[in-house]
Amino acid sequence: MTANARGAAANQQALLSPNVTLVFDGGSLGNPGKGYGSFITRGAVQTGDPERREYAGRRTNNEAEYMTLLEGLRYILREAQATGQDPTTLMIEVRSDSKLVVEQISGRWKVKNEGLRPLHAEARELLRRFGNWQLTWHPRSESVRYLGH
């Protein structure tokens, strides 16, 4: 097995066994309207109950989704650092019912909306601070099960 093959196998194994799972969901009352979101983490960094956020100004649903992802990633980084964990050793599984966010962050869809581009760039930058990560889409019912909405 070559070094590249070993590295790829190690990365795949790490993704099969994440240290931290982040589940997030954002939305808006009206679209655009008052933005809100919730996230929960499990594993090496845990929130306990879901963390709830409200966003100032008028937000689209997609903006609120991205903003909640950012809040969740920042939370994991803060808590890891506060407990002496090196974020580069963490393998993060991010789960969402937002097909748009999952596909854009994964690079399969382009970010066409100007307002989402800085949020997308920041999310990608935060994800680079972890050892490895993967985004997974799940049905809306999973978000409801984890977050209560």
Kindly give the residue locations of the regions a language model identified.
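RNase H-like nuclease fold core
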Residues: 2-63, 67, 74-78
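RNase H catalytic domain
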Residues: 27-31, 70-149
